[in-house]
Amino acid sequence: FKEWSDKDITNLVKHHRNHPSIVMWSIGNEIPEQWSQEGVQIAKHLQDICHQYDPSRPVTQGMDKAEDALKSGFAQVMDVPGFNYRVHKYYKNIEQLPQGFLLGSETASTVSSRGVYKFPVVVSDKATYPDGQCSSYDTEYCSWSNLPDDDWKMQDDYSWVIGEFVWTGYDYLGEPTPYDTYWPSRSSYFGICDLAGLPKDRYYMYRARWNEQQHTTHLLPH
C-alpha cells in the first residue's frame, strides 16, 4: 500500500478525469482503519491527491462502521461522507457531520431469485428455503441490510440524504448470502439483474424510481 497507493490514485484520476460519467471519486470501501487517526491521515492524503489532479469533483468512500468513523473524525474529513447500509442510523450520523449531508454509498442488499415466488409472503432478514432460492417478491434481506423502500423513504423525507449506490446491479460469483454454507449455492442473490443479465422483478421497481421520463408497468404472479 505504501509503495503503490499514491501512484494508483494518481493514475486513476488522470486516466478517467475527462470521462463525463464520473461524478465523484472514491478512495476506499469498508477499510479497517476507520476508527484510527492513522486512517484519518490516510483519507486526507488520498483525498488531497484527488483534489490535486481533479479539483472539480468531490471525494467519497464507503464506511461500514459509522460509530467508529464518526468518533475518530474519519467521516468528517471526507468531501462526501458515504455510509454503507444501516439506514436507521442516518439520523444519528447526520448530527455529527459538518458537511450537512451524507450518501448511501452501499445500499439495499435485498436478496431475490429471478422467477421464484415464495408463499406465504413475509418480510424477513433471515429467510431460507430447502431449494436454496430467495423469493422474487423482494421482501427478503440480510441482518445488516434492508429493503429498497427504506432507502427511498430516507431520500424522500430528508434532503440531506443525497442519493445511493445500490448493492448490487448484477448477481456475481461468491457471497451467496443467505446460503453461505449451502452447496451448490455459489453466487450472490443481491443483484437487480441475475447472472445472465436478465432483470429480476426488482429491476422494475428501480426503473420506476429512477426513470421519471417514462412510465413503468410490470406484472408478476400473485
Label for each model-derived stretch:
Residues 1-222:
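Extended substrate-binding grooves/exosites of carbohydrate-active enzymes
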